[in-house]
């Protein structure tokens, strides 16, 4: 009872201080964007959610629930969904992009005419651009050069954030002031936010871990055990480190929340769509069938293709990524790929 009273007092105090902010807009009404919007609405902010899908907009506004992406979670009254991007963005200082990574560039181009010049762009997407290999912050900065860009990443499944289960994430930016603003904006007594100055490491860790989670799911689907998953995760973090350092990231970042932490939760959680897709593929479904069954974007599939191209170009050893690419895009048998991984040349750890 005392804890509930403290939380209510804390929420009311935060709500008073938040009256000066006109609102926060989320571009994309998926599960994670909705969960973060609910969390910030509880702090007293007015939340706008823009989405293309009429049924998502209707459900949020009329039923106060995102039935498609975050069912059985009540959405507060100070959350409103919009079909028009201009209406959702005008006068807003904080804009959270929560769309699939492949849509980032198009979304930024569509937003450009409606943004305040000092609006801070916060991306919670994870991935890199196919063919160019550019990180999402680079894409956003190319399209919106006047606006500060902040990346929010870490082990944070939407289903748990929406239920106020204690969660810890990281924000990073080339603009230190913007990073600190976003840290303050998102921090609650159930959602702890650290800052980190290694934007490259944070973004690469968050993108590559989805590849490892897909592989871990396939292992589970085949019927392999904890030994196999432990090996995949441990060797997987080494792949993250190798490609991450090659791209300019710092090794210590990959052992933190946005590397090891995010990989652990994505490889093991029942909420992980990447692990779930891998599980289905391991049980015999095709990649297309697995995506349809999951019903949401599986970032690890696009990441696998993009990082396969990038590691070939940079000549970085990523054997798990290699094996997954052959399973997904060349039709090789997953068990045979595991056999190949296990019988590679002997070497020191």
Curated annotation (Swiss-Prot):
Catalytic activity: sn-glycerol 3-phosphate + NAD(+) = dihydroxyacetone phosphate + NADH + H(+); sn-glycerol 3-phosphate + NADP(+) = dihydroxyacetone phosphate + NADPH + H(+)
Alphabetized GO MF terms: glycerol-3-phosphate dehydrogenase [NAD(P)+] activity; NAD binding
Pfam families the record matches: NAD_Gly3P_dh_C, NAD_Gly3P_dh_N
The keyword Glycoprotein is assigned to this record: no
Residues binding sn-glycerol 3-phosphate: 126, 154, 156, 209, 262, 272-274
UniProt-annotated catalytic positions: 209 (proton acceptor)
GO CC annotations, alphabetized: cytosol
Keywords: Cytoplasm, Lipid biosynthesis, Lipid metabolism, NAD, NADP, Nucleotide-binding, Oxidoreductase, Phospholipid biosynthesis, Phospholipid metabolism
InterPro entries in alphabetical order: 6-PGluconate_DH-like_C_sf, 6PGD_dom2, G3P_DH_NAD-dep, G3P_DH_NAD-dep_C, G3P_DH_NAD-dep_N, NAD(P)-bd_dom_sf
Ribosomal protein listed as a keyword: no
Compartments reported by the entry: Cytoplasm
NCBIfam families on file: PRK00094.1-2, PRK00094.1-3, PRK00094.1-4
Family: Belongs to the NAD-dependent glycerol-3-phosphate dehydrogenase family.
Function: Catalyzes the reduction of the glycolytic intermediate dihydroxyacetone phosphate (DHAP) to sn-glycerol 3-phosphate (G3P), the key precursor for phospholipid synthesis.
Name of the protein described by the UniProt record: Glycerol-3-phosphate dehydrogenase [NAD(P)+]
């Amino acid at each position: 009872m005392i804890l509930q009273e403290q939380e209510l007092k804390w929420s009311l105090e935060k709500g008073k201080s938040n009256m000066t902010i006109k609102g926060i807009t989320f571009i994309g009404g998926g599960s994670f964007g909705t969960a973060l919007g609910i969390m910030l609405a509880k702090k007293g902010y007015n939340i706008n959610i823009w989405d293309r899908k009429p049924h998502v907009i209707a459900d949020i506004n009329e039923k106060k629930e995102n039935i498609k992406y975050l069912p059985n979670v009540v959405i507060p009254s100070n959350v409103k969904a919009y079909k028009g991007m201009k209406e959702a963005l005008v006068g807003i200082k904080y804009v959270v992009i929560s769309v699939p990574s492949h849509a980032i560039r198009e979304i930024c181009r569509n937003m450009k005419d409606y943004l305040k010049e000092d609006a801070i762009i916060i991306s919670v997407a994870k991935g890199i651009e196919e063919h160019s290999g550019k990180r999402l912050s680079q894409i956003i900065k190319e399209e919106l050069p006047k606006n500060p860009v902040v990346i929010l990443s870490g082990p944070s499944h939407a289903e748990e954030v929406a239920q106020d289960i204690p969660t810890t994430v990281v924000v990073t930016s080339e603009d230190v002031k913007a990073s600190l603003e976003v840290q303050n904006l998102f921090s609650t007594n159930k959602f702890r936010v650290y800052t980190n100055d290694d934007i490259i490491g944070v973004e690469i860790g968050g993108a590559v871990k989805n590849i490892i989670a897909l592989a871990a799911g396939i292992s589970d689907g085949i019927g392999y055990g904890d030994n196999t998953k432990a090996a995949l995760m441990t060797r997987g973090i080494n792949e993250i480190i190798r490609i991450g350092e090659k791209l300019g990231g710092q090794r210590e970042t990959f052992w933190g929340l946005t590397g090891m932490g995010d990989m652990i939760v994505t490889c093991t959680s029942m909420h992980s769509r990447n692990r779930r897709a891998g599980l289905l593929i391991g049980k015999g479904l095709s990649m297309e069938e697995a995506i349809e069954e999951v019903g949401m974007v599986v970032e690890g599939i696009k990441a696998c293709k993009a990082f396969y191209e990038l590691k070939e170009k940079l000549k970085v050893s990523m054997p798990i990524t290699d094996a997954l690419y052959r399973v997904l895009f060349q039709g090789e048998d997953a068990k045979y790929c595991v056999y190949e991984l296990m019988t590679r040349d002997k070497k020191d750890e």
